[in-house]
């Protein structure tokens, strides 16, 4: 697979304007990235501009804290799919996970998978807030719930992707589930290290620099 197809070209800053999003979209077309990842209010715009290409539209749900209710996340997912999203990056309920409420976490992911209507679902586990044991549990629950990917980070918390976390996540989910590294990846060397450790997708706001 060519390097560009690993990349979700990402712009999730709250101050991003329509002009910024359109620039992101044009870059994704030019460099043939896997997707653009935008906030939900920009999904329609991205869909309209990408529907005749093979660049997917990715959006976020329960972002960035993961602390909204399951019902809210399910509704967000349904609206995003209606608006044209191909991929959903949902944030796990970190507090519920850390409280040992495994069934809550698993059922929530399962409901979002169902609401996504066979679109790709990636579960952001926010590795920087978890112990090693919690990282393993988050990955296991995501896999059991039918998600397609586990993802390291929102990029809005206390840390981003680390190679050792990618390695642990890959070992936990096995070879048939996707692993997405995101947060703090700024160079091609960093991206290649993530891929070597098992990442099958890279989330980055500097996608153009990564493939130049």
Curated annotation (Swiss-Prot):
Pathway membership: Carbohydrate degradation; 2-deoxy-D-ribose 1-phosphate degradation; D-glyceraldehyde 3-phosphate and acetaldehyde from 2-deoxy-alpha-D-ribose 1-phosphate: step 2/2
Localization (cell): Cytoplasm
SUPFAM superfamilies in UniProt: Aldolase
This enzyme's EC code(s): 4.1.2.4
Pfam families linked: DeoC
Gene Ontology CC, one term: cytoplasm
Catalytic activity: 2-deoxy-D-ribose 5-phosphate = D-glyceraldehyde 3-phosphate + acetaldehyde
Catalytic residues (UniProt): 89, 151, 180
Disulfides per UniProt: none
GO biological process, one term: 2-deoxyribose 1-phosphate catabolic process
Keyword set, alphabetical order: Cytoplasm, Lyase, Schiff base
PANTHER family: DEOXYRIBOSE-PHOSPHATE ALDOLASE
HAMAP family named in the record: DeoC_type1
Role according to the record: Catalyzes a reversible aldol reaction between acetaldehyde and D-glyceraldehyde 3-phosphate to generate 2-deoxy-D-ribose 5-phosphate.
Name of the protein described by the UniProt record: Deoxyribose-phosphate aldolase
Organism: Clostridium botulinum (strain Kyoto / Type A2)
């Amino acid at each position: 697979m060519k390097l560009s197809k690993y990349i979700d070209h990402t712009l999730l800053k709250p101050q991003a304007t329509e002009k910024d999003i359109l620039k992101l979209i044009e870059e994704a077309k030019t460099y043939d990235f896997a997707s653009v990842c935008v906030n939900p209010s920009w999904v329609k715009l991205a869909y309209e501009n990408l529907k005749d290409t093979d660049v997917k539209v990715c959006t976020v749900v329960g972002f960035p804290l993961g602390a909204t209710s399951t019902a809210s996340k399910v509704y967000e997912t349904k609206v995003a799919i209606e608006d044209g999203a191909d991929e959903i990056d949902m944030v796990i309920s970190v507090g519920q996970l850390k409280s040992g409420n495994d069934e809550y976490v698993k059922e929530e992911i399962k409901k979002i998978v169902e609401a996504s209507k066979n679109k790709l679902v990636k579960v952001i586990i926010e590795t920087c807030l978890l112990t090693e044991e919690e990282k393993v549990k988050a990955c296991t629950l995501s896999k059991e719930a039918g998600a397609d990917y586990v993802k390291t980070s929102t990029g809005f918390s206390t840390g981003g992707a680390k190679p050792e976390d990618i390695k642990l996540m890959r070992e936990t989910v096995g070879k048939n589930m996707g692993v997405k590294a995101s947060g703090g990846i700024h160079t091609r060397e960093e991206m290649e290290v993530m891929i070597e450790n098992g990442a099958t997708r890279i989330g980055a706001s500097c996608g153009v620099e990564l493939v130049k």
